[in-house]
UniProtKB/Swiss-Prot annotation:
The modification N6-(pyridoxal phosphate)lysine is found at K269. PANTHER family: GLUTAMATE-1-SEMIALDEHYDE 2,1-AMINOMUTASE, GLUTAMATE-1-SEMIALDEHYDE 2,1-AMINOMUTASE 1, CHLOROPLASTIC-RELATED. Homodimer. It comes from Tolumonas auensis (strain DSM 9187 / NBRC 110442 / TA 4). This is Glutamate-1-semialdehyde 2,1-aminomutase. Its cofactor is pyridoxal 5'-phosphate. One of its GO terms (biological process) is protoporphyrinogen IX biosynthetic process. PROSITE patterns: AA_TRANSFER_CLASS_3. It comes from the Bacteria. NCBIfam families: hemL, PRK00062.1.
């Protein structure tokens, strides 16, 4: 069957009449690569199937949650069983207790956990808690890092904000944004200088331990340790945003992988197993400040939803199987190193980063990418061309040069081989 996008084009045209930009999250609109977004009809294992009948090997994984692959039987069974008992109660359930206990067991630095509905809710609530606990207003974040779309975090943000060229969003009052101080990721000197000026006013640092919203940028040695030391020195809290890296870089997330102890952690994506779930947690003395035990208010009609908790519990049980993360890391290494080798064979400069089950590639001749300013200098036009060539080959990558890629347990050796063979053909067309 010839490759066609006719039905996706029809749906995108219709969607733009009813939905702003035709999508419900900006990066899905393909603004970063041009063309028509593929409308997906179903997903299974490592594959997406669009409304035109095209099959794609998927390296987006619903932007991170699908660590085990799409439509995993254990998660699907748990959801179907939970649905039999009702969709939502607005009251406490056993499943949310079990979920919190399992998170604590896996990530012991999260002594108490509050469930929410998204990663944005988790980061927004954690920052409010940090401000309430410390009695300070200012926060520190990093240019190009993305922590959701709360007002205080849309200052020099990453992810779709970078894709759209709007790192400072209209609608965020200047009086509000002034409390957000922005530093350079992987540059401790910029953090130290900021604290030297505002240390007594800073409530927290919030950081992606692996920056996954300006592509994939792991921390340089000593960076996370330095943030911990600075927070300790000035009495600020360290919030590690593990919405993307949690249970993906390792079972204990990036904090376990790099051996860093945060004061607060935010989670999302994988903990919902594909359902909308977020969480934040940390030291008991800090979490005690959250209502109803403390004065910092946070609430949610659907928080701890029983169907979502069932999916999350099934996911967290499944990912604890021995050897799973070694397998994922090896699959990721094969894809990342394979892309690099395929590009080199065609004389195309490509730098690749990867850690755990996430990876990123950059069209640049710089041998190492560790900072946002380097990402911004990469060849975006080359990425766009490569993206569309790969899409026609049946490989679905994130439609933005600023987003990381994700492996799942469902990706087979054959899938990886097919991906790399496709990449070599695409690179050959780009010479």
């Amino acid at each position: 069957m010839a490759y066609s996008t006719q039905r996706s084009e029809q749906l995108f045209t219709a969607a733009q009449q009813s939905i702003p930009g035709g999508v419900n999250s900006p990066v899905r609109a393909f603004n970063g690569v041009g063309g028509t977004p593929r409308f997906i009809a179903k997903a299974d294992g490592a594959y997406l199937f669009d409304v035109d009948g095209n099959r794609y090997i998927d390296y987006v994984g619903s932007w991170g949650p699908m660590l085990l692959g799409h439509n995993h039987p254990a998660i699907k069974a748990a959801v179907l069983a939970a649905v039999e008992n009702g969709l939502s109660y607005g009251a406490p359930t056993e499943s949310e207790v079990l979920m919190a206990e399992m998170i604590r067991q896996i990530m012991p630095d999260m002594e108490m956990v509050r469930m929410v509905n998204s990663g944005t809710e988790a980061t927004m609530s954690a920052i409010r808690l940090a401000r309430g606990y410390t009695g300070r207003d200012k926060i520190v974040k990093f240019e190009g890092c993305y922590h959701g779309h709360a007002d205080c975090l849309l200052v020099k943000a990453g992810s779709g904000a970078l894709t759209l060229g709007q790192p400072n969003s209209p609608g965020v009052p200047a009086d509000f944004a002034k409390h957000t101080l922005t530093c350079t990721y992987n540059d401790l000197a910029s953090v130290e200088a900021t604290f030297a000026s505002y240390g007594s006013e800073i409530a927290c640092i919030i950081v992606e331990p692996v920056a996954g919203n300006m592509n994939c940028i792991p921390p340089v040695p000593g960076f996370l340790e330095g943030l911990r030391a600075i927070c300790d020195k000035y009495g600020a809290l360290l919030i590690i945003d593990e919405v993307m890296t949690g249970f993906r870089v390792s079972l204990q997330g990036a904090q376990g992988y790099y051996g860093i102890t945060p004061d607060l952690t935010t989670l999302g994506k994988i903990i919902g197993g594909g359902m909308p779930v977020g969480a934040f947690g940390g030291k008991k003395e800090i979490m005690a400040y959250i209502a109803p035990t403390g004065p910092v208010y946070q609430a949610g009609t659907l928080s701890g939803n029983p169907v979502a908790m069932a999916a999350g519990l099934a996911m967290l049980k499944a990912i604890q199987q021995p050897g799973l993360y070694d397998t994922l890391a090896e699959k990721t290494r094969q894809v990342a190193e394979g892309l690099k080798a395929a590009a080199a064979k065609q004389g195309i400069p490509l730098t690749v980063n990867y850690v755990g089950a996430m990876f990123g590639f950059f069209f640049t001749d710089e041998p190492e990418i560790t900072r946002f300013e380097q990402v911004s200098r990469c060849d975006i036009d080359a990425f766009r061309r490569f993206y569309h060539l790969m899409l026609q080959e049946g490989v679905y990558l994130a439609p933005s040069a600023y987003e990381a890629g994700f492996l799942s347990l469902a990706h087979s050796e054959a899938d990886i081989a097919e991906t790399l063979a496709a990449a070599e053909r695409c690179f050959a067309q780009m010479k």
